[in-house]
From Swiss-Prot:
GO cellular component: nucleus
Keyword set includes Nucleus: yes
Organismal lineage: Eukaryota, Fungi, Dikarya, Ascomycota, Taphrinomycotina
Chain intervals with Low complexity compositional bias: 172-189, 455-471, 544-554
Keyword RNA-binding attributed: no
Zinc finger (C2H2-type): 572-603, 610-635
Main location: nucleus
Biological source species: Schizosaccharomyces pombe (strain 972 / ATCC 24843) (Fission yeast)
Protein name, as recorded: Zinc finger protein rsv2
Length: 637
């Protein structure tokens, strides 16, 4: 509209001679009505209001529900003393004003209670249209109407929808509007909450390295479960189901072979809804103990064992408990032996039957992982012969109870409760090539291109890391680590033993590459600084590099100076006597200038004490620069 004529209308109304009256507009419910008539002093409407509608246009835009009355400027009004001073342009601005009549009953969680048709985006972040960047469903606006959205609360009383509510719908009930004769209702779908309630989620015993949406759950085999209305489908079995048929353990078969025969594996993690009901599970276990069918399936070997009789589920089929994943604390793969130990600790896990939909997939995964683990171990053909040489004569540092050709059943039963998953493929421990030295070196660091370290008997080795395992020697391998208390009598014997062992090692590693050469101990010169070394314990580090004695000693001393600067023997030392204690000062300085300044100030042998002339004898200084600073700061000189 053109607002330039507003000034002209105000000038007419402000003129005292014209007495231009203004009508009185007031609210009546939700409508604006004209209560009084006024006169225009013979002026036409087009002269005062050039932009006013004509009668035909007014009839077109007016609605019968509004009950608007046409303003007649020629009508006279006698009593207009109580009229408010309104501009002639203001009452023509028929602007709808929203009135919240039912403000107390508004839903505080629905901010857009009266959505306007001109709104492009809603203010409700929970609406699906907001997430899809679409327009909000339009509802006709009116005067005094309150389109209040009524949300349906969940049945369980929580703020989050349950899994049974497949379609999350919020209906908007709109009251009859003042200027519209129809009821408006809008329905919008709300997505499930980002964080579901704890009652609808099972404890997942594995961790994914990637983030999944809230509707996608991966089972134990890595497959994505079906996505339907329920984002968390967990088909928990009933508690009163029949137990699985038991199996009998043959005494002739080993535990590992019996576990390998049973190849059916579950597909997903265990459901916590079934494990939480401890009382029902105990009752079901007690019922299983009294059943005759379970007692008949128990073999005589297990009947003799009281622990097996107390818990007959130990002999059940391992289909119900053999899972690829363990509890929440351990997400690694478990071998059948380690799984049996976990089953003995948790009897509830064994009683949980799992579906066999992904048995083949899980079995293939387990076989692939077992093959990958076996590829890291030495093969059977390379057990006795390592790199073309027979190493069965080489003794091992392991304990004697481990050195046996095959693990018997007793040792397997003793190793079952171990926390770490055991290796499914066992091989002879003594066939592993051991180190020549009896030190605690990591056996995994021994590679075909890395020869063993041989040190002659006249060399003392001081290792920086402490020994973590005791050194075990045997009659076949002499002691190559003599201590400092060795006398000169056994030195030739040790030297000959070391030479003989060195020849064996050379013959063993003669097929290696040409760049790996074992150093000759006869050409190795080891220089050790004397007992007068200035260390804390009187010991000095040993450098076994084949260099000269003077070079090694100088390098070791230079290294100590670099890393032990505070404890080094400096180039200059103060030998003057301290006047207070009467002892030698022995202060070490790295520069001669620092030593001279120290002697001139602390000991004051060459220069007198500097006194302040202004302060007198009260202030005296041992250094001249201190006196100059005092005069500048205190006295302004």
């Amino acid at each position: 509209m053109d607002t330039t004529n507003n000034t002209y209308a105000r000038s007419i109304s402000s003129n005292g001679n014209d007495n231009f009256p203004t009508p009185d507009w007031q609210f009546n419910g939700s409508q604006l009505q004209q209560n009084r008539k006024s006169k225009m002093n013979g002026r036409s409407v087009t002269n005062v209001f050039p932009n006013a509608f004509s009668d035909a246009e007014f009839e077109q835009i007016s609605m019968p529900e509004l009950n608007l009355k046409r303003f007649n400027p020629t009508t006279l009004e006698e009593n207009n003393s109580d009229l408010s001073d309104m501009s002639s342009w203001d009452y023509m601005m028929n602007v709808p004003i929203r009135v919240y009549n039912d403000a107390d009953t508004m839903d505080p969680f629905s901010l857009d209670t009266i959505p306007d048709s001109s709104m492009d985006m809603p203010f409700d972040p929970l609406a699906s249209d907001y997430g899809n960047a679409a327009n909000f469903p339009s509802v006709p606006s009116s005067l005094g109407s309150n389109h209040q959205f009524i949300t349906t609360p969940p049945v369980n009383g929580s703020n989050e929808p349950t899994s049974a509510q497949t379609n999350h719908i919020i209906t908007a009930n709109s009251s009859p509007s003042g200027n519209a004769g129809s009821n408006a209702s809008a329905s919008m779908s709300v997505p499930p909450p980002l964080t579901p309630s704890a009652s609808t989620i099972n404890d997942q015993p594995f961790s994914n390295s990637f983030d999944l949406p809230s509707q996608v759950i991966a089972d134990g085999t890595g497959a994505i479960s079906d996505i339907n209305g329920n984002p968390f489908p967990m088909n928990s079995p009933p508690l009163d189901m029949e137990p699985l048929p038991s199996i009998s353990m043959d005494a002739s078969d080993s535990v590992s072979e019996q576990l390998v025969k049973d190849a059916s594996l579950p597909s997903g993690p265990f459901s916590t809804d079934y494990l939480e009901n401890g009382s029902d599970l105990k009752r079901s276990l007690g019922h299983n103990q009294k059943s005759d069918r379970v007692s008949k399936d128990v073999s005589p070997q297990h009947q003799a064992n009281p622990s097996t009789l107390n818990n007959p589920l130990k002999t059940q089929n391992f289909d119900s408990s053999k899972n690829l994943y363990t509890d929440n604390k351990d997400s690694s793969l478990v071998s059948p032996t380690g799984l049996q130990s976990r089953m003995e600790q948790n009897p509830e896990v064994r009683a949980h039957p799992m579906k066999d939909s992904a048995t083949s997939t899980a079995l293939r995964r387990s076989h692939a992982l077992g093959a990958a683990a076996d590829s890291l171990l030495p093969q059977e053909n390379s057990a006795q012969i390592y790199d073309g040489k027979d190493v069965s004569m080489v003794n091992d540092n392991m304990h004697s109870d481990v050195r046996q050709d095959s693990f018997n059943k007793e040792s397997i039963k003793q190793r079952i409760p171990s926390l770490s998953p055991p290796i499914t493929r066992s091989y002879n421990a003594k066939h592993r090539p051991s180190l020549v030295l009896g030190t605690s070196v990591n056996p995994h660091s021994l590679s075909p291109s890395q020869p063993p370290v041989v040190v002659p008997s006249n060399t003392t080795i001081s290792s920086s890391p402490p020994l973590t395992s005791p050194v075990k020697t045997s009659a076949n391998i002499p002691n190559l680590l003599p201590t400092s208390e060795l006398d000169s009598s056994n030195a030739p014997h040790s030297q000959s033993a070391a030479t003989h062992d060195l020849n064996d090692v050379k013959s063993y590693y003669n097929t290696r590459s040409s760049h790996s050469v074992v150093p000759n101990p006869t050409n190795q010169k080891v220089s050790i600084t004397g007992a007068a070394a200035d260390g804390p314990n009187g010991s000095a580090p040993v450098d076994t590099t084949p260099t000269n004695s003077s070079t090694t000693a100088t390098g070791a001393q230079r290294k100590r100076r670099k890393f032990k600067f505070g404890k080094q023997i400096g180039p200059v030392r103060c030998t003057l006597q301290n006047r207070v204690t009467g002892e030698i000062c022995n202060t070490v300085f790295s520069r001669t200038y620092d030593l001279i300044r120290h002697q001139d100030t602390i000991h004051a042998k060459t220069r007198p004490v500097f006194r302040c002339e202004i302060c007198g004898d009260q202030r005296h200084f041992s250094r001249h620069d201190a006196l100059v600073r005092h005069l500048r700061v205190k006295h302004g000189r």
